[in-house]
Amino acid sequence: MRPARALIDLDALRHNYHLARSRHGGRALAVVKANAYGHGAAQCARALAADADGFAVGFLEEALELRAAGIDQPILLLEGVFAPAELDEVVRHDLWIVVHHAEQLRIIDHARPALPLEVWLKMNSGMNRAGFLSHELRPAWQRLKDSGKVGGITLMTHFARADEPQVLATTEQLTAFDTATRELPGPRSLANSGAILGWPAAHRDWARPGILLYGADPMPDEPNGLRPVMTLESAVIAVREIPAGAPLGYGARFHAERATRAGLVALGYADGYPRSVPNGTPVAVDGLRTRLIGRVSMDLLTIDLTDLPDAGLGSRVELWGANIPVNRIAQAAKTISYELLCNVKRVRFEYSG
């Protein structure tokens, strides 16, 4: 059996959820969209089912997968509905919906739901991606109330730069939201992962922890006690001696500065490890750090074993996890941890805890 695998620590997931809820102080929807950021939505939701106040997913199909897996807590559709027929499924499966644009208001106007809808009304407070502008928010809220088809309305927004504590954008968005919603009743939800950890003023009724659940800290240089949930690992499957000056791999991107003992590892970019990382990117072999050498290929990558004389065939190689933070690999690849985690595929997933 190929040794490439993703080890998912469900105890760490629960730890991170409790940390998020404790830091925020209110209720928390665990965000498990995009297959729980690549970790397995059904497995992660089941692991949190006894603790979570609810879950958030992207769209209806993701919610139905959770219901089929036995999840009966509230589930919020962050993108809302796309067509009138979806409202029947929303009611049938007791789902909550975000309303963030006029077409969704029109869908509700023309619907005849069997039960009142639970709506989260989204304001565009400055991210300019989704939501009603400040002057549109009260009319949208009133239209929902007057429809007679809505039960509760939670007011929400989303921050563009909560993971940048030195910039004013989050404060400006907070001010815009509070000004626009001052006279409107109902619960509020503002805090994403960055705001949970770094912006206490954004702590209201509901938090929406996402990336922090999976142990990738969104805040720079601030140890927050998160535990990595995924360890991406494989093993050394061959060892080769590379003479000083000899090239290695596609494009001869690496030339040995000295006689080099190279370990071939059964994992590549088809498994989700980024091709863009440079020579020198850290890996851990049997818990000891060394470096990537040569270009990452589809199924394989190569590491430097020269200074690890005890390492060899079968040695465990951690690409990210407890020894190698996924944020470090994301930085090397000039991307974000979200993308790396969501892209893990083809490897064997093993769950513990």
Curated annotation (Swiss-Prot):
Its cofactor is pyridoxal 5'-phosphate. SUPFAM superfamilies: Alanine racemase C-terminal domain-like, PLP-binding barrel. It holds the Pfam family Ala_racemase_N. InterPro entries: Ala_racemase (IPR000821), Ala_racemase/Decarboxylase_C (IPR009006), Ala_racemase_C (IPR011079), Ala_racemase_N (IPR001608), Ala_racemase_pyridoxalP-BS (IPR020622), PLP-binding_barrel (IPR029066). The active site is at residues 33, 250. GO terms for molecular function: alanine racemase activity; pyridoxal phosphate binding. Substrate binds at residues 129, 298. GO terms for cellular component: cytosol. Its EC number is 5.1.1.1. The modification N6-(pyridoxal phosphate)lysine is found at residue 33. Keywords: Isomerase, Pyridoxal phosphate. Pathway: Amino-acid biosynthesis; D-alanine biosynthesis; D-alanine from L-alanine: step 1/1. GO terms for biological process: D-alanine biosynthetic process. It catalyses: L-alanine = D-alanine. Catalyzes the interconversion of L-alanine and D-alanine. May also act on other amino acids. This is Alanine racemase. It comes from Aromatoleum aromaticum (strain DSM 19018 / LMG 30748 / EbN1).
